[in-house]
Amino acid sequence: MDQWLEEIRAALPELVVYQQEPMKKHTTFRVGGPADLYVCPKKQELPVILGLAKKKGLAVTVIGNGSNLLVGDKGIRGLVIEVGAQMNAVEVQGNILRAQAGALLSQVAAKAAAAGLGGMEFAAGIPGSMGGAVTMNAGAYGGEMKDVIRQVTVLTPECEQKVLSREELDLSYRHSCIPKNHFLVLEAELSLTPAPEQEIRAKMAELREKRVEKQPLEYPSAGSTFKRPEGYFAGKLIMDAGLRGYAVGDAQVSEKHCGFVINRGNATAAEILQLMKDVQERVKKQSGVTLE
């Protein structure tokens, strides 16, 4: 690890490398132990960082905005790469919007609205970045990334850039081919639909109101904790199992929306995992449905 640090500092003297960085600072759950090494690189620095990590046998974990993510109390060994503020450029040409992987979905939706392009309204309130949204085919309120993606540029494990079409991405409910191939999203190209800016902003405001009304946005969480089982709603299954407000330490099933597990202040990853396990067991016993 020391040798990697030495070599990376020689190769990229401007790159800031944090050591023993608390991951709770970088997740929306506000939970997680320290990362051995932590960087937030520019796009052109990624191949150098990954190449050196591979050469030294250093484990690599890539994160985006830290939503939909639970980091253990002991943290993450090796190197954590945040695809974030150094990779968040967004540009519009005609009805095509290009966004780097670190661009926040709220930022992308706002840029699309300002250009009079509809299609990203559903994503305006999702607390994630473009890279994560593509990787898991993020969606809300009847929309998903699959509806708007034209193509995506990724970095392969061999540090080569590759362009994937929407078909090649194999997008389905909260799924893409990216994780199994160990690709790293660099940029997404979206095909959007011209619409009056006022209408787009009105739709975004309407969805924002729904979120504020129905979701526990006042507490740290990772968003919806469980996938929606086919034919059911996870939140209703949890509520029907009598688990509204159920808590383990400072981890709690939200009273506002049972599909969310929240951190009431000082929850640990162990408490959250135990809570999730308890919920899965109770729901399975009550309804026969397995929550993922």
Task: Mark where each language-model region is.
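Short, electropositive, low-hydrophobicity segments enriched in small/polar residues
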Residues: D36, N68-L70, I76-E82, S106, ...
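Hydrophobic, well-ordered secondary-structure segments
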Residues: L105, A109, A123, P127, ...
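Anion-binding (especially nucleotide phosphate/pyrophosphate-binding) glycine-rich loop
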Residues: D2-M130
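A generic local secondary-structure boundary/capping motif
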Residues: N68-L69, A109-A112, M120-A124, N137-E144, ...
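Phosphate/pyrophosphate- and phosphate-bearing ligand-binding catalytic cores of soluble enzymes
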Residues: Y18-Q19, L155-Q274, E281-R282, Q286-E292
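Structural signature of FAD isoalloxazine-binding scaffolds in flavoprotein oxidoreductases
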Residues: G32-G33, Y38-Q44, L70-N88, T135-R166, ...
